[in-house]
Amino acid sequence: MNSFRKTCAGALALIFGATSIVPTVAAPMNMDRPAINQNVIQARAHYRPQNYNRGHRPGYWHGHRGYRHYRHGYRRHNDGWWYPLAAFGAGAIIGGAISQPRPVYRAPAGSPHVQWCYSRYKSYRASDNTFQPYNGPRKQCRSPYSR
């Protein structure tokens, strides 16, 4: 078992050592760059095409476009403030319901006949008023309180 551990440790060391060499071989070599002519001036045109998309413009992205009535598809501003409150509220309600202790349902006191049969026979079953004797089939329980 000890030699197996040594073999595994040696194999892992060999694998890690071999894989660390590969990135150094794959690195690009530094090449001498040609000198840049300093007389060239970079210029950028400052015009926009006719159908230029300005991107996000505050107040116009799914917002009021000047129409008199509400139009479908537009985003109403400031209507998302209640989402986190609803999520935390739902979590609190569900968590409170889960953490409540289970209700304890007490068995009815029963009649003196049932109590007498339970105390007399370990295998007594009140649903059909029988008990299991050591030999034979189940038998009816007959107590001094029998009906």
UniProtKB/Swiss-Prot annotation:
Its placement in the membrane is given as: Single-pass membrane protein
- Other facts: Strongly immunoreactive, inducing both humoral and cellular immune responses in hosts during the course of infection.
Which sequence ranges are marked TM in the entry?
Answer: 80-100
Organism listed in the record: Brucella abortus (strain 2308)
What start and end residues bound the annotated signal peptide? 1-26
Q: What is this protein called?
A: Lectin-like protein BA14k
What is the consequence of disrupting this locus? Rough phenotype, with an aberrant O-antigen profile. Mutants exhibit a reduced ability to colonize mouse spleens but are still capable of producing a persistent infection, albeit with a low bacterial burden.
| Keyword entries, A-Z | Cell membrane, Lectin, Membrane, Signal, Transmembrane, Transmembrane helix, Virulence
InterPro entries for this protein:
BA14K
Molecular function (GO) terms listed? carbohydrate binding
Question: Which family does the similarity line name?
Answer: Belongs to the BA14k family.
Protein purpose = Has immunoglobulin-binding and hemagglutination properties, and can bind to mannose. Essential for virulence. May be involved in LPS biosynthesis or polysaccharide transport.
